[in-house]
């Protein structure tokens, strides 16, 4: 299950198991796979092309995954970039919508403001 604000910017094969819980503002690029196994994934996940998330794991908020990486263990900290096979923390990184530019950041903040006003 995905939260709101899912972005799939390119056409291509994307496989996601149905027992996973994935937060808001997730971005999935072409040729990515998030296998089944009840993963718990926070908000603002960014999965680059060719990456795989496998095993029963947990990922924190604002996790970016580099191209062709294999994530097979939990990373509970947020604001990180994972790369490699198996993946490891490459560096600290803000949420993708902050890193990618002002228009993305403004859109996310506008949605959150609207959501708060409706509650």
Model region roles, listed by residue range:
Residues 37-119:
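Glycine-rich hexapeptide-repeat left-handed beta-helix
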């Amino acid at each position: 299950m995905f939260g709101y604000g899912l972005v799939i910017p390119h056409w291509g094969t994307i496989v996601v198991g149905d027992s996973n819980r994935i937060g808001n503002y997730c971005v999935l690029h072409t040729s990515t796979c998030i296998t089944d196994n009840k993963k718990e994934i926070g908000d603002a996940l960014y999965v680059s092309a060719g990456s795989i998330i496998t095993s029963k794991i947990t990922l924190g908020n604002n996790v970016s995954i580099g191209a062709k990486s294999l994530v097979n263990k939990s990373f509970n900290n947020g604001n990180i970039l994972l790369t490699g096979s198996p993946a490891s923390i490459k560096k600290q990184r803000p949420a993708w919508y902050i890193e990618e530019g002002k228009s993305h950041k403004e859109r996310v903040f506008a949605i959150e403001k609207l959501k708060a006003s409706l509650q």
